[in-house]
Amino acid sequence: FFYVNPLEVVPEACQKDQRKKHVKPIRQKWFACACCPPNLARLFASIGGYLHFIRAETLYTNLYVTSTSEFTFQGLPIKLHMDSAYPFDEKIHISLSLPRPMEFSYAVRIPAWCADYHVLINGKICAGTLKDGFLYLHRCWRDGDEVELTLSMPVRVVRANSLVRENIGKSAICRGPIVYCMEQTDN
């Protein structure tokens, strides 16, 4: 089920097409299927699993949020601290606390919108291997190692797909993952 977006509704089309009879041309005060409150509670309970995850011998960071996470990796307790003002700032600082040196791959997510990024490990440029949206950094990690990830966020214009009739000629202005809204009265 998708809620109706009143900014995209053509009232005449809803009235003439029986298949669209359920589509309301104005925002409803309440929906009979109130799924937001329980989904929000579920999100808070599971947010840690969205930030980082482990698969085989690789530790992944998927979301960039100021946080401290503790987990067991390769049978050892490790701590990962992240400082970030993402998505408003391009730089993400990550530090690792390890009980001893450990060799493994640490994979950081590079969003599809990001065409230019760079990584410093302990102040030195690191290339890594980009695969399936993650930059893999394989090395012997030591306690106190610092990773600085910079995701370049130039302002860009994203044009709508011309095959979507209702969106022909429409564009969005974006910076990083943020899509800016310009409503009808402002355009």
Cite the ranges covered by each PLM segment.
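Solvent-exposed beta-strand/loop surfaces of large extracellular or lumenal domains
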Residues: C114-H138, V157-L163
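Short, glycine- and charge-enriched coil/turn segments that flank and shape catalytic ligand pockets
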Residues: P99-E103, N122-K131, D143, N187
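Glycine/proline-rich low-complexity spacer/linker segments in large multi-domain proteins
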Residues: F1, L151-N187
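Aromatic (Trp/Tyr) and acidic
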Residues: F1-I110, C114, H118, L130
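A generic structural signal for beta-strand entry/edge sites
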Residues: D89-K91, D132-F134, G144-E146, K170
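C-terminal beta-strand-rich structural cap/linker in extracellular carbohydrate-active enzymes
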Residues: F104-A107, L137-S152, R156, E183
